Amino acid sequence: MSWPVLAAVAAGGALGALARAGLLAATPQHPATADWGTVLVNVLGCALIGVLMETLTRRPNPHPLLRPFLGVGVLGGFTTFSAAITDATDAFAAHQPGEALLAIAANLIGALLAVSAAAGATATLLDRAAQRKKT
């Protein structure tokens, strides 16, 4: 991996982590329960990666640092599945197994649905825009 790519990932990761910290600070947190702000961050981040990847695959020559910066860096730093599992572990330890399992399911299923729906919606919008350009 080249130094410019590493720098792009590092800069993007810092921005993504700061955005996550800001969003998590703005969401209510309750002790001994799963952190639903983490679910929000992961689902939103996965939706954005769906938009990004669909957009980049349709560009003829995207800048070589765009995907490392935005995808791996910003969105990789924004999402946090390790924190989601830690939150679920904390909920289990607090004798809240239902909350823990619901949070795990919300993170995993929500993320899969978000990336799929966002990529599909982006593809539809880009196809419509391309059709309008032709007419």
Swiss-Prot record:
One of its GO terms (molecular function) is metal ion binding. It holds the Pfam family CRCB. It is a multi-pass membrane protein. The chain crosses the membrane at residues 5-25, 36-56, 68-88, 100-120. GO terms for biological process: cellular detoxification of fluoride. Its main location: membrane. GO terms for cellular component: plasma membrane. Keywords: Cell membrane, Ion channel, Ion transport, Membrane, Metal-binding, Sodium, Transmembrane, Transmembrane helix, Transport. Na(+) is not transported, but it plays an essential structural role and its presence is essential for fluoride channel function. It is found in: Cell membrane. It catalyses: fluoride(in) = fluoride(out). Na(+) binds at G76, T79. Fluoride-specific ion channel. Important for reducing fluoride concentration in the cell, thus reducing its toxicity. HAMAP family: FluC. Belongs to the fluoride channel Fluc/FEX (TC 1.A.43) family. This is Fluoride-specific ion channel FluC 2. It comes from Thermobifida fusca (strain YX). The gene is fluC2.
